[in-house]
Amino acid sequence: MSKTLSFKTYSAKPADVERKWYVIDAEGQVLGRMAAEIARVLRGKHKPQFTPHVDTGDFIVVTNAEKVALSGNKENLKTYFSHSHYPGGVRVDSVKDLLRKKPEKIIEHAVWGMLPHNNLGRQLFRKLKVYAGTQHPHEAQAPTEMKIH
């Protein structure tokens, strides 16, 4: 008798997932390309046991957020729009202002737009840590450096 072949789809369990820590230096990196790679790793799509409804991704620490590069003339033209839901509560911030005040928000906003907008996406987003300088408080996790091409 020959053994029958099984074609069952593997579904990852949260307990089976091994998480790694990566650190990315944002200096000179193009924002959109870097954000796409970060979203892919946060989601876990780089792993063979990727399962769409399970958090299989890794942690990412981004440093030098204030030195991120934008292609074209986006530094002068791109704006971020938000509203407080009160009359006259419109707020429009330019990239130039955000780079000066809160450079972490630019990377967080770009990555959030590339993640699922549901409970899983919020859980994935919590694994992203962005810092303006070169220092970060995650040395104890021994993150490995990730290069983005």
Curated annotation (Swiss-Prot):
Pfam families: Ribosomal_L13. GO terms for cellular component: cytosolic large ribosomal subunit. Gene3D superfamilies: Ribosomal protein L13. Keywords: Ribonucleoprotein, Ribosomal protein. One of its GO terms (molecular function) is mRNA binding. One of its GO terms (biological process) is translation. Belongs to the universal ribosomal protein uL13 family. This protein is one of the early assembly proteins of the 50S ribosomal subunit, although it is not seen to bind rRNA by itself. It is important during the early stages of 50S assembly. Part of the 50S ribosomal subunit. This is Large ribosomal subunit protein uL13. It comes from Chlorobium luteolum (strain DSM 273 / BCRC 81028 / 2530) (Pelodictyon luteolum). The gene is rplM.
